[in-house]
């Protein structure tokens, strides 16, 4: 596992964008795994600036990590809406090549299998962008998630619901279920890029990078990935003991 420590959040965005840019230039039709939430927003903004400056990402495909169950794609609180706003439109991607797990439907279990099939038909994910929750979750794979899990409907931990309540009018409006790519799905990406900023992520980064590989910290599974890179700022790296922040 490679560790890159930047001075601050802006440096994290630049370092992460360099990784994506190098991939896109080497493989213009790359398939990206797209994290949602606040962690990757700096990366997406930096990529948007590079696209405005001439970086061509029009042939890139994308698969989002997760979605809330019960929110329609045009709901401004949905991750489908977030992906359109922060990725598809500013990076000038083809909307037909950007996929988000369905949060509504008659049979979400079948839809999850179809999502896995779509990733396979695209040739797999070249680079999976990831954030990390304060409880160590990846995507919406909460603690106790099986390390070999696939895309599925899952329950949201109360900790995660509290963290995400800031995006909703009231805490009770946060959905209790989600659709998420599984840890096994994430591990099949050819490269994994984990982004973290701020002191609130220091404990989870320390566990993910230096703790035991365990379902109690889902992100720790990345220790087993053959090509994983963690890009974090000094605050998020503050509790690492094997590298200098």
Predicted regions and their residues:
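A glycine- and small-aliphatic-rich helix-loop capping segment at beta-alpha/alpha-beta transitions
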Residues: 46-56, 81, 143-153
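ATP/nucleoside-binding phosphotransfer catalytic cores, i.e., glycine-rich phosphate-binding loops
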Residues: 181-184, 188-245
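Class I SAM-dependent methyltransferase SAM-binding "motif I" and its flanking Rossmann-like core
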Residues: 135, 139-183
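Ligand-binding beta-strand-loop-alpha-helix segment within the catalytic cores
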Residues: 56-129
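Glycine-rich beta-strand-to-loop/alpha-helix junction loops that act as flexible
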Residues: 34-39, 130-134, 197
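N-terminal glycine-/serine-/threonine-rich phosphate-binding loop
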Residues: 1-32, 245
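Glycine-rich N-terminal segment of FAD-binding domains in flavoprotein oxidoreductases
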Residues: 26-51
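A short secondary-structure junction signal
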Residues: 110-112, 139-145, 149-151, 204-208, ...
């Amino acid at each position: 596992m490679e560790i890159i420590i930047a001075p601050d959040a802006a440096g994290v965005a630049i370092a992460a964008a360099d990784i994506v840019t190098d991939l896109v230039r080497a493989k213009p039709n790359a398939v990206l795994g797209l994290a949602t939430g606040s962690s990757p927003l700096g990366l997406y903004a930096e990529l948007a600036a590079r696209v405005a400056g001439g970086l061509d990402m029009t042939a890139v495909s994308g698969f989002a990590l997760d979605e809330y169950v019960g929110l329609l794609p045009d709901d401004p609180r949905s991750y489908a809406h977030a992906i359109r706003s922060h990725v598809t439109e500013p990076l000038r991607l083809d909307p037909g090549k950007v996929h988000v797990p369905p949060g509504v439907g008659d049979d979400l279990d079948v839809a999850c299998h179809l999502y896995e099939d779509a990733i396979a038909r695209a040739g797999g994910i070249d680079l999976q962008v990831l954030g990390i929750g304060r409880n160590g979750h990846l995507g919406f794979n909460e603690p106790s998630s099986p390390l070999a899990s696939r895309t599925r409907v899952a329950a949201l931990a109360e900790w995660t619901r509290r963290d995400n309540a800031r995006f909703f009018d009231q805490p009770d409006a946060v959905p209790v279920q989600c659709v998420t790519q599984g840890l096994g799905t994430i591990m099949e990406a050819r490269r994994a890029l984990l982004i973290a900023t701020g002191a609130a992520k220091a404990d989870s980064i320390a566990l993910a990078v230096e703790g035991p590989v365990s379902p109690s910290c889902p992100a720790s599974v990345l220790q087993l990935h053959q090509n994983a890179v963690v890009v974090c700022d000094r605050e998020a790296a503050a509790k690492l003991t094997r590298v200098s922040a």
